[in-house]
Amino acid sequence: IGVRLVGSEMCIRDRYIIWISEIILQQTRVVQGYDYFLRFMNRFPDVDALAAASEDEVLKCWQGLGYYSRARNLHAAARQIVEWGGFPERYENIRQLKGVGDYTAAAIASFAFGLPHAVVDGNVYRVLSRYYGIEEPIDTGHGKKYFAAMAQELLPEGKEAADYNQAVMDFGAMQCVPKSPKCEDCPLVDGCAAFRDRRIQELPVKSRALTVTERYLHYMYIEVGGEVAVFRRESNDIWKGLYEPFLIETPAACAPENLLNDEKVPSFIRSDKAVMTYLCGGVRHQLTHRTLICDFYKVELADRPDDFGRSVCWVKKEELSNYAFPRLVVMLFEKFGLW
């Protein structure tokens, strides 16, 4: 985004745009992030607007992009920038912003300020490892340092550095893609070690496979007189800062007829006064390291209970859309017309 979405003719005032776009692109492809980028920029057109917003407002605008720690870090960093009196212009100072690592700091330094810092993202890892036939794993500390040093050595001097950075990233995103790269019309194919040695699919190398765990969620949409009980996730877990219906998590799958026996189910849900409806089950939602398997219930009560054991917000059904919910919850609400 930034240079990649709004064009390469950037002036110095666009450092804010570049920063926001690079944070969005940390875990999101350009084609997926474009509309979110425009929405975010429309809602928070400058760093002062972002810093002045509440965390709930920022998370609501970010809703659907995932990896919500990015939004929380953006918000915190915006307040850092305001406190400092302006956007930092040196790599070392940019690196001190909340949520900004080596890659993002290099991207901002290069694209916003024309500083000679190599930008190394997944596309760059892939291009360099394939072209030079490098077997160094890209997901280890040593490997990351190896590729960063190599990219820095290859970086041209002067004003061409930013264009070179952008060119390699774009080449990886459009030509040397992860699966089925376009080798037949690649301008670099004659010098490509991976093509020559038929190792396209083997490179880049990763040292460890991704471990995915399953989690079993049972959401209860509790409604009393047109108001719905929602809860803000506060722990350092998935979706921190977002809202959700009442949740019971079990270590394994649990059939509806057995769920009421779980000690985490409040007594008011077990009572004869509660009207509980099983809406759907086994809904799978994939996160990077987790597979969420969700059952969804609706519970209708005559009076507000007072023994949730945690802080609750009672929200009018028609106002639920003002709150930031995980995509999984939004899909369930929409499927059953619950907001």
Where are these regions (language model features)?
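Single conserved hydrophobic/aromatic residue that forms the stacking wall/gate
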Residues: 1-7, 12
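ATP/adenylate-binding site constellation spanning eukaryotic-like Ser/Thr protein kinases
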Residues: 7, 55, 121
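Intrinsically disordered, low-complexity, charged terminal extensions of DNA damage-control enzymes
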Residues: 8, 173-339
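Short, polar/flexible loop-turn hinges at active-site or ligand-entry regions and domain interfaces
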Residues: 8-9, 31, 65, 84, ...
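Gly/Gly-Pro- and Ser/Thr-rich, intrinsically disordered tail segments characteristic of DNA damage-repair
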Residues: 19-20, 40
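A short secondary-structure junction motif
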Residues: 22-35, 67-69
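Alpha-helical ds-nucleic-acid-binding substructure associated with the helix-hairpin-helix region
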Residues: 37-98, 102
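Contiguous mid-protein beta-loop-alpha structural module that forms a pocket-lining wall or clamp
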Residues: 99-213
